[in-house]
């Protein structure tokens, strides 16, 4: 249960060891690491570094020339475009990971899994209300992290953002 880094690697290892593997994930393969944490934050860092390199180019002896005339660039940060790019990169990596799992023989279920005893899982596929009960010799729970909300500082999506909301803000 869970398709983040831990669940992803466990599923691949299980198949390589000859097991029949079902991976249940409701938000996308790669989990928060790929979709809302590592990939997006590294993309933001790389974008900020690129803007800084352009801004400091003249101090390093690099001059920008347009139509034979030196120009001093104005750095303009387009946050909606940056967010769209980083979300696209995250979705692309998630899709690649899904394709890898499927190519290796993992059955991926888009849905929610709940333990039902020692050797059973109730699977509710996304968009459905009924559950299917499956039996498993081994169950790995790798459900990852969730943003912690403090009673005194609940995220409202405007003034207080959690790390999942951050990448969907506009201007």
Residue ranges of each PLM-predicted region?
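Glycine-rich flavin
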Residues: 12-19, 24-170
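Residues forming the Rossmann-fold NAD(P)(H) cofactor-binding site
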Residues: 8
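Glycine-rich Rossmann-fold phosphate-binding loop(s) that bind the pyrophosphate
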Residues: 2-5, 26-27
């Amino acid at each position: 249960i869970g398709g983040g880094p831990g669940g992803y690697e466990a599923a691949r290892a299980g198949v390589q060891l000859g097991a029949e593997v079902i991976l249940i994930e409701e938000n996308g393969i790669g989990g928060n690491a790929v979709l809302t944490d590592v990939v997006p934050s590294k993309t933001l860092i790389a974008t900020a570094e690129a803007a800084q390199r352009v801004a400091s180019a003249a101090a390093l002896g690099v001059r920008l020339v347009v139509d034979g005339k030196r120009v001093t660039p104005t750095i303009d940060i387009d946050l909606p475009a940056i967010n769209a790019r980083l979300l696209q990169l995250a979705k692309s990596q998630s899709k690649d990971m899904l394709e890898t799992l499927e190519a290796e023989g993992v059955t991926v279920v888009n849905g929610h899994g709940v333990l039902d005893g020692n050797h059973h899982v109730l699977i509710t596929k996304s968009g459905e209300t009924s559950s299917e009960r499956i039996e498993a010799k081994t169950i790995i729970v790798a459900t990852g992290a969730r943003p912690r909300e403090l009673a005194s500082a609940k995220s409202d999506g405007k003034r207080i953002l959690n790390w999942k909301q951050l990448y969907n803000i506009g201007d």
